[in-house]
Amino acid sequence: MEEADTTQDSVVVEDTDTKQDSVVVEDTDMIVANGVINKLNTTKRLNYLKQRVKTLLKKPQPVQRSPEWFFTRNTIITASEAASCLTMSRAVCEKYAKLYNLTNFKFNDTKSTNSYEKMEDYIIKKCKAFNGENVFFDSKYTLWGKKYEEVALNLYKNIKKTEVYEFGLLKHPILSWLGASPDGITREGVMLEIKCPLTRKITGIPPLHYYIQVQIQLECAFLDEADFLECDIKEIETYEEYNEIKDIPKGIVINILEEPDNSETKYIYQNAKESEIEPYEWANGKGKELKEGSYSFIYYKIVNYSIVNIKRDKEWFNNVKNDLINVHKKIRFYQNNKSEYDKYFESIKLLKNKKHIQNINESVCLLD
């Protein structure tokens, strides 16, 4: 059953299609759903979006890593997970393929839209997390992305000349089983999603699983557009090489060297408000505030970046909504029925073993 978020906040907007001076909408989550925003001119629309951001900022959020936070994340589908619930069917992918002119796109009703995770593996992962197992492990790719997300964010702020607000987990105001953790939302109401790929080439086309992530984020926040920012960042070994770089963005990250009992790497970044200071001058100034030998400089350059604006597609979401609901029902069923989960887990393991044996046999046949 879909549960409604009862958090309400009044907002007044002028209705351009009537002679009334204004209309009062008690719940700003509903203003988009009721189509009111489509009646507003540019200025009034911007005012609404700014109010919408204020409403989102006031929404209560569980303290990160608290029992409530873990329970919420483990019992809903989040935007970054949604691609693991869907397949590359026409219903899911046709609009994406047309939008980016992917004429050779291959539809497949059984293949996951997340090339890194199949649906059955995702269901098992959610059940393990629900039961207290640690299922989230960083790779060199995720660590790189985390390391340079702040650099990309400051680049975006400087380009767009705007402020970006941070958010934790935003639950959908109506669909209680859906949530999102965007990288930020601008004061003008534009969602921001940041990716800093370590090896993947930036093409100007958002990969399918990230496009799905952004669409779900927009749904959860009831916003109309997002900027998908990708940055190709390379590290530089020496100051001399760094100093020779001209005409492309570059900078320095200060790496706080780990204490023996501290496994978490810490960094200090030059923020957007400090951008007028030359990075080396900034880093040396910060270094004077730190204990000698407790830090090092990491020089970097931004070789390439891309900002792709993605519009919210309500029709697309309606096409995939039932698929997401069905996966969520499976997750909650297995989370609350251990014996059934054990059967499911064993059946998936058996299928994988059979597939593995089949692949070995096929390889042997090819060798013969």
Please identify what each model-predicted range represents.
Residues 1-368:
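Accessory terminal regions of nucleic-acid processing enzymes
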